[in-house]
């Protein structure tokens, strides 16, 4: 049990810091669009696809590795709450078009990136 808690916690620390770093880097560069959140969600969607494809094909690693990578790292890297806040702010500012594009980019993009992650794994694996 404690190894599971540790695995999730360490993964979450890494994922949250990656998300924070992406926000600092990309949101500061492009003020009009919160690119850091989008990149975090899309890359996290791709990564979780690769990881789930890997873990479904492999029993070499202990379950704690899946908890670390999927629940901890990907769970903290992707961020529905920040996405929701940014889209709500766009709506409050009357930026309906930006909000709609943002919602579609995050939701549809994340699903497509997850599928791409599974495809990437199958292509690499052969």
UniProtKB/Swiss-Prot annotation:
Locations listed in the record: Cell inner membrane
Activity regulation statement: Na(+) is not transported, but it plays an essential structural role and its presence is essential for fluoride channel function.
GO molecular-function terms, A-Z: fluoride channel activity; metal ion binding
Chief subcellular location: membrane
Amino-acid positions noted as binding Na(+) in the UniProt annotation, renumbered to this chain: 75, 78
Alphabetical GO biological process terms: cellular detoxification of fluoride
Pfam families reported for this sequence: CRCB
Keyword Cell membrane: yes
Transmembrane segments: 5-25, 35-55, 68-88, 99-119
Reaction(s) the record says it catalyses: fluoride(in) = fluoride(out)
Membrane topology: Multi-pass membrane protein
Family: Belongs to the fluoride channel Fluc/FEX (TC 1.A.43) family.
Function: Fluoride-specific ion channel. Important for reducing fluoride concentration in the cell, thus reducing its toxicity.
HAMAP family linked: FluC
Protein name: Fluoride-specific ion channel FluC
Gene (name only): fluC
